[in-house]
A protein has these predicted regions:
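Short glycine-rich substrate-engagement loop in P-loop NTPases that contacts/grips substrate
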Residues: 87-89, 94-120
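Alpha-helical transmission elements in cytosolic ATPase-linked domains
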Residues: 56, 105, 137-140
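Single conserved hydrophobic/aromatic residue that forms the stacking wall/gate
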Residues: 145-156
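Short loop/turn elements that form and flank the Walker-type P-loop nucleotide-binding site
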Residues: 35-37, 68-71, 82-87, 115-118, ...
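Walker A/P-loop
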Residues: 2-3, 32-33, 37-84
Length: 156
């Protein structure tokens, strides 16, 4: 089966991420201590590993056998996230899903508890492409997640 080069060679563990030691250390420490925030914003120029770190983080917070804050890469959850069969980790491309209805759909999904994982993780790639109304809806969603009891196992 064909796989794009960036998918084939994308780092799968924090230790494989290059030139991001500070953020990798902070994320590992949060995972190891069990103090995971409800929202993270990764910024930087193209190709610096923002999406890669988000995907590794999604695996690490849900991994059944984490090792020093890294995902094991072998458990059912890690393999399921890698092959896309785990529905609790969702990657949304905001460049093509940039409307307020897309964010409202995301907000509605956060009301449900995770089905297979410890956390539901939403990775919004290219978030700067959201419309103004969609971004406002996202901010409202983040505030609801922060104060709402049923959605405390959600990370955006």
């Amino acid at each position: 089966m064909y796989r794009a080069l960036y998918r084939k060679w994308r780092p799968q563990r924090f230790e494989d991420v290059v030139a991001q030691r500070g953020i990798v250390t902070a994320l590992r420490n949060q995972i190891a201590s069990g103090r995971v925030g409800h929202a993270y914003l990764f910024t930087g120029v193209r190709g610096t590993g923002k999406t890669t770190c988000a995907k590794i983080f999604a695996k690490a917070v849900n991994c059944l056998h984490p090792q020093n804050g890294d995902p094991c890469g072998e458990c059912e959850i890690c393999r399921g996230i890698d092959n896309g069969s785990i529905l609790d980790v969702v990657e949304m491309d905001a460049a093509s899903n940039n409307g307020v209805d897309d964010i409202r759909d995301l907000r509605d999904e956060t009301a449900y508890t995770p089905s297979a994982c410890h956390y539901k993780v939403y990775i919004i790639d290219e978030v700067h492409m959201l419309s103004t109304s969609a971004f406002n809806a996202l901010l409202k969603t983040l505030s609801l997640i922060h104060i709402s009891e049923p959605t405390r196992r959600v990370v955006i």
